[in-house]
Every structure is written in C-alpha cells, then in structure tokens.
Amino acid sequence: MKAQVLHKYDPEMKEKVWVTEQEMPDPKLEKSSDVIVKIGAAGVCRTDLHIVEGAWKHIQDPKGDLLPMVMGHENAGWVEEVGKDVTGFKKGDPVILHPIISGTDGTCLNCRRGLDQHADEGAFPGLNIKEGGYAELLKTSVRNLIKLPTVLAPKDVAPFSDAGLTAYRVVKKATRHLLPCLLYTSDAADECSG
C-alpha cells in the first residue's frame, strides 16, 4: 500500500516536505476483534504539526525509535476486512474511527468506565504507534468504529474523529447530569419544563 511517511522531526518547521510517499506492507488482522479500514480521508490538525516539529517527542517517542512512521489520527473510510469475532460491520460499510485503540479491546477498568483515553495498553495511530491514517489501509479495533450513514462521505467527517468525537463524548456524559429527570419517562419532561 502507499503511505505518507515522516522520517525526521523538523523543530524549526523549515523543510519544504515533511512526509514522503512510499510503499508499505498492508496491515494484517492479528486479533479476532481487528478491522482493516480502507482510508477515504484523513484530517490534518495542529497535533500533526506538533508531531512534525517534535514538540511531543518526549512523550510519544521517548526512546527515539518511533520514526519512520505514518502519521494521521483523524480517519474515516470503509471497512475492508474484519476479524472473526467482529459483528455489526461488513466490507464496504462507511465508518469513522475513534483515534484511541484500547489494547484490551475495552475490557480494562478505564474502558469499562468510559475513560478510553486512559486505556491500558492504549495506542494512538499516527502519534505513538507507527501506523496512522495517511495510508491506503489502517488496522484498528471494532471498538473504535462508528458506522456512518451512507449520505456522509469519509472526506466530510474525518476531521471530526478527534475534535468532533471528543465534544460528542463530553455532551453525552454531561446530559445525564444536566437533566436527570428526562432520562426516566416522557411525562417527566413536562415536569422539567415547568
């Protein structure tokens, strides 16, 4: 597959080209919950520029062995292949990918509490693992897929896989605390409104 690869950090951001296109091996299913996604679009955000300049090298690459790597953590595309335990997704389904992959497939305590950002063995494609979405294919976990309606194209939603899903999660968690009476019955809505 073709991929855009970062080979060196550029602290001064003066290089004319930061990534180069090269052939990489296609990702392979390893776990029964793995999914290979054909990337339709990958967003670029300020985080990517911080990666290029090495601003987070002390966090994401403390040993200095992460490069070369394929960047890209804001990804959307179509399901290409699914592991044997994957249900609810099939080849061709349009999806957006949550950027954090839990190494425990959601079974660790933090994931069960809805704190995936603190997942045990968590991986962040294009940030702390070498395989990101600036490629034709990306391996992820079924837990990280959100099926898209067919009226949405991956190019229209890829940037939302980071900032958009982050905001969505905050709203989803907050709503149960803001209007708790709405969670029980529709009759309670009249009581809440006054």
In which residue ranges do the predicted regions lie?
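Short structural boundary motif marking the start of a folded domain
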Residues: 1-4
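Short polar catalytic/cofactor-binding loops
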Residues: 7-12, 42-44
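Short glycine/threonine/proline-enriched tight-turn/helix- or strand-capping micro-motif at secondary-structure
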Residues: 14-25
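NAD(P)H dinucleotide-binding glycine-rich loop of Rossmann-like/cofactor-binding domains
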Residues: 64-66, 73, 102-182
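Cytochrome P450 core scaffold surrounding the K-helix E-X-X-R motif
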Residues: 47-49
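Secreted/processed peptides and extracellular or luminal domains of membrane proteins
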Residues: 51, 114-117, 194
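Single conserved hydrophobic/aromatic residue that forms the stacking wall/gate
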Residues: 184-194
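Glycine-rich beta-strand-centered segment in the early N-terminal region that forms part
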Residues: 25-43, 57-109, 149-151
